[in-house]
């Protein structure tokens, strides 16, 4: 926790540290996660193709599972995760914005407000 001091009306008020998160950093992190999923999906797809071609055994259900079911599961999962991160980020901004205003009004002079 980083605590900064602010001089206002002859009293010290503590302001909590706001992490440098915004839409672009969240999008970048999300794309990194998708790239990791893409690599794992390509690996699983190559393994399923190896089973399909090199062993001369027809596994249509396994092939369909690796080609369609797993990518669909990962895409839905990561879209929901991204929406959850965005929602919690905006809730954090609202909490920090209104919480700082309320704590400045309610804090007695000479005390730190630690959140």
Swiss-Prot record:
Tell me which parts of the chain lie in the Extracellular compartment. 33-52, 99-115
Cytoplasmic compartment segments? 1-11, 74-78
Indicate the transmembrane segments per the record.
Answer: 12-32, 53-73, 79-98
Q: List the disulfide bonds.
A: none
Q: What membrane topology does the annotation report for this chain?
A: Multi-pass membrane protein
- Keywords for this protein: Membrane, Transmembrane, Transmembrane helix
**Localization terms from the record:** Membrane
The entry's cellular-component GO terms read: membrane
Q: Which domain of life is it from?
A: Eukaryota
Q: Protein name, please?
A: Putative uncharacterized membrane protein YLR311C
Taxonomic lineage: Eukaryota, Fungi, Dikarya, Ascomycota, Saccharomycotina
């Amino acid at each position: 926790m980083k605590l900064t001091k602010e001089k206002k009306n002859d009293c010290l008020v503590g302001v909590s540290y706001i992490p440098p998160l915004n839409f672009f950093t969240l999008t970048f992190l999300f794309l990194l996660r998708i790239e990791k999923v893409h690599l794992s999906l390509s690996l699983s797809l190559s393994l399923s193709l190896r089973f399909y071609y090199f062993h001369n055994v027809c596994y249509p259900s396994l092939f369909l599972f690796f080609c369609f079911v797993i990518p669909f599961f990962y895409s839905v999962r990561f879209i929901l995760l991204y929406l959850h991160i965005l929602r919690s980020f905006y809730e954090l901004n609202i909490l920090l914005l209104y919480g700082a205003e309320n704590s400045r009004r309610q804090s007695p002079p000479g005390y730190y407000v630690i959140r």
